[in-house]
Amino acid sequence: MKKAYRVKSDKDFQAIFTEGRSVANRKFVVYSLEKDQSHYRVGLSVGKRLGNAVVRNAIKRKLRHVLMELGPYLGTQDFVVIARKGVEELDYSTMKKNLVHVLKLAKLYQEGSIREKEI
């Protein structure tokens, strides 16, 4: 995933948390904030309670890969995905299904309307 598609600064994270809205399911929480930009930006958060650094990094790698696949279906908002307990046990396809579900609830996933892929 290109750096232009990532939320990195603490200021951006705090703006999304304070000004944005949140949606959750059993495995993920998504905070989103509408922005006037040409593509989405995403921040990932995986807490220490999910496991050691190896486990947390594996979760983040899977999430980044799922988000790269879903990129053409995502809007132009900034959003943060927070992994909840139990996500470390999910395989790739189940993780993708759960993430698509919560992104649909947040109205970030636009099924059927594919933007031109920029990733």
Swiss-Prot record:
GO molecular function, one term: 3'-tRNA processing endoribonuclease activity
Cellular compartments per GO CC: ribonuclease P complex
Subunit structure, as described in the record: Consists of a catalytic RNA component (M1 or rnpB) and a protein subunit.
UniProt-recorded name of the protein: Ribonuclease P protein component
GO BP, one annotated term: tRNA 5'-leader removal
Gene3D superfamilies: 3.30.230.10
Database matches in InterPro entries: Ribosomal_Su5_D2-typ_SF, Ribsml_uS5_D2-typ_fold_subgr, RNase_P, RNase_P_CS
Annotated SUPFAM superfamilies: Ribosomal protein S5 domain 2-like
Coiled coil: none
